[in-house]
Amino acid sequence: MKKIFIVGSINMDLVIDSPYMPENGETITGSNFMENPGGKGANQAVAVSKLGGASYMVGKVGKAFGRELKETLSSYGVNIDYVKEEENISSGIAVIVVVDHDNRIILDKGSNALVDKKLIDNALKDANEGDYVVCQLEIPQESVKYAFEVAKSKGLTTILNPAPAAKLIDGILENTDYFIPNQTETELYIGILPDTIDKAKEACIKLTEAGVKNTVITLGTKGSIAYSNSKFVFANAYKVEAIDTTAAGDTYIGALTAKLSEGSSLEDAMDYASKASSITVTRRGAQKSIPYKNEIK
């Protein structure tokens, strides 16, 4: 089985439902407060593990919530040999306000800002040709760049979820095999909001012209579109009653990667990822909302 190294963020999500987004200076009453282990990196690592892949988390936690975050990852079958604890800083924190089944997120990177070359070297020394490295942008971009440089030197496949969207430093895109943004991120990167199929195709072409090898854009309720080897690939969304979209994108990334690592086609992997994320949004929470492989029909 191919190893999948997720080099990324590990957060504690502090979640509260709100009837609406408060105005400046306004205090309102929320409900259903929860503490949920999260972070895009950790969520994707859990998704990989729950959906059939060999998941290895590479990241850092701090004093606050650190032990709990590691124990939670391990409980889902994620290898935590490359998760380091830092004593003098908090773990990453995400404050998530849920309004009408959608969410707004504020991050404090905390220990995620300390993911460095030493940690990456320690993890990827154990990687073999054909393994996978997955990154997001909740850790320093220099660390993403380095992880991908090491990955390509060892013959690994690299996957970038460019979230939160930010201008990419030189050296990342050219070492990215799969670039997987959502609609909002796509618009921020290339100025095209892919809210129709024609615009999604246009966005894929423009990303290819910018140097992306394989593009997969998630389109929410419209499914997802990919452009690979000069061909478009589509996957439909599955209609469900969404309750919480917090981990939908992370589920998609993890499911897609797990399936690709098994040798599946991109089309099959995208359909599998759509099925998995459609289940996630019907449940509250982040990692606990991600389905297991045996739940995907």
Regions found by a protein language model. Name each.
Residues A45-A54, V98, A258-G263:
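Alpha-helix C-terminal capping segments
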Residues I4, A54-S55, I80-D81, T158, ...:
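Hydrophobic anchor at the start of a short beta-strand
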Residues N24-T27, E35, K50-D131, K297:
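Conserved N-terminal subdomain of the carbohydrate kinase-like
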Residues M1-V58, G66-E71, A242-I243:
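Glycine-rich phosphate/adenosyl-contacting loop at the front of the ribokinase-like
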Residues Y132-E202, K222-S224:
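Conserved beta-alpha-beta core of the PfkB/ribokinase-like small-molecule kinase fold
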Residues I4, K167, I197-K297:
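Conserved phosphate-binding/catalytic region of the ribokinase-like
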